[in-house]
């Protein structure tokens, strides 16, 4: 158990050391901002390690469409092989409006963005993690197809997954959505395990892990949009009536529709809160671990005693953060699924009107 916690911290330090040159350590000019944002950001290649002075990377396919020259498809390694530019495209330098993005130049010499559907690091990690999730779910489904319902309870990995699935289904979906939970269970279960798998893989400090998938706001935006569609597309008449004509005093609705406006605004703030909550928590966790690891290299020029002390402290804090991030990986998946289930359940709830009998 101790080795399982120490290993990620050690491998992360080794990975960051690839980005820090001996001259930077000696002069104490380690650019923490560049290292941190380089690791949590997206990229057109996947950096594995550095062998000697040679970075070992996986070049990824670049697929772009230019209004002037049409479609282009090539590996990102072609950019480096041709001095940073290939077929009129290059990576925008630091300080540019499109820093780190693939750009081309128009007839006036200005940088413009082509239609970019390239397979980036986050995209590849998303595909790998989705395939991993698919294999896990299909293996569980295969076991249940082969065994009748009255067979003995499964053990091992299948039993663990059954416990996990039943926990999410019974404790979150069924209790929050209500009687119509079966309609939404497939989406909510998928959302939970998708977020959980991506969170866990983001903590693995070597390929194919380490990509900051759920710390990418585009990913969390799509997840929140799915919940937004599920809530509003399947909302009952009562749900929409409570938005446009809520049960509040009439003077809060006419002549100024203050409460209807607030309720309508809430349609968009709920998924927005889901998006920001997941994005911010996962991004902050990755940044905290990277900054703690950078302390080792920042203190290299401060003498062996101070450097050794800070290294020990940094490793201990990293072990603590890795253990905490394991918990956060589960909690964030749980919270996102629970809030989505609550929002869906509120949109499904029918108000019961009690009629008192007169004697």
Residue spans for each PLM region:
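Membrane-interface helix termini and inter-helical loops of multi-pass transporters
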Residues: 206-210
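Hydrophobic alpha-helical transmembrane segments and adjacent short intramembrane/lumenal linkers
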Residues: 189-193, 197-204, 214-222, 226-338, ...
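Juxtamembrane interface elements at the cytosolic ends of transmembrane helices
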Residues: 135-173, 234-242, 351-352
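Membrane-interface helix starts
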Residues: 144, 176-185, 280
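Cytosolic juxtamembrane amphipathic/interface segments immediately preceding
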Residues: 112-115, 166-180
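Perimembrane topogenic segments of multi-pass inner/organellar membrane proteins
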Residues: 7-155
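Sec-dependent N-terminal signal peptides
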Residues: 1-5
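Alpha-helical transmembrane segments and their helix-start/interface "positive-inside/aromatic belt" motifs
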Residues: 122-123, 182-187, 215-217
């Amino acid at each position: 158990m101790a080795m399982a916690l120490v290993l990620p911290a050690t491998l992360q330090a080794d990975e960051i050391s690839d980005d820090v040159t001996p001259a930077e350590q000696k002069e104490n000019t380690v650019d923490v901002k560049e290292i941190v944002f380089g690791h949590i950001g997206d990229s057109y290649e996947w950096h594995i390690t550095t062998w000697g002075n040679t970075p070992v990377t996986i070049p990824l396919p670049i697929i772009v469409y230019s209004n002037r020259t049409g479609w282009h498809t090539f590996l990102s390694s072609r950019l480096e092989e041709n001095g940073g530019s290939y077929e009129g495209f290059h990576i925008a330098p630091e300080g540019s409006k499109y820093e780190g993005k693939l750009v081309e130049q128009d007839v006036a010499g200005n940088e413009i963005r082509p239609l970019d559907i390239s397979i980036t690091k986050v995209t590849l990690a998303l595909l790998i993690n989705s395939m991993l999730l698919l294999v896990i779910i299909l293996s569980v489904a295969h076991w249940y197809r082969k065994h009748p319902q009255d067979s003995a309870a499964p053990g091992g990995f299948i039993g663990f997954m059954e416990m996990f699935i039943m926990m999410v289904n019974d404790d979150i979906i069924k209790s929050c959505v209500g009687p119509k939970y079966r309609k939404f269970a497939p989406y909510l279960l998928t959302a939970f395990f998708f977020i959980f798998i991506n969170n866990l893989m983001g903590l693995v400090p070597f390929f194919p892990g380490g990509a900051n998938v759920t710390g990418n706001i585009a990913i969390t935006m799509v997840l929140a949009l799915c919940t937004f569609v599920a809530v509003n597309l399947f909302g009952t008449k009562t749900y929409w009536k409570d938005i446009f004509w809520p049960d509040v005093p009439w003077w809060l609705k006419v002549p100024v529709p203050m409460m209807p406006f607030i309720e309508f605004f809430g349609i968009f703030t709920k998924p927005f809160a889901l998006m920001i909550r997941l994005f911010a928590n996962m991004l902050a966790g990755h940044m905290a671990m990277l900054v703690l690891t950078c302390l080792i290299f920042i203190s290299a020029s401060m003498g062996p005693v101070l450097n050794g002390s800070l290294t020990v402290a940094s490793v201990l804090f990293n072990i603590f953060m890795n253990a905490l991030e394991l918990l956060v990986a589960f909690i964030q998946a749980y919270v996102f699924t629970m809030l989505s289930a609550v929002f869906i359940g509120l949109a499904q709830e029918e108000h019961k009107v009690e009629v008192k009998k007169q004697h």
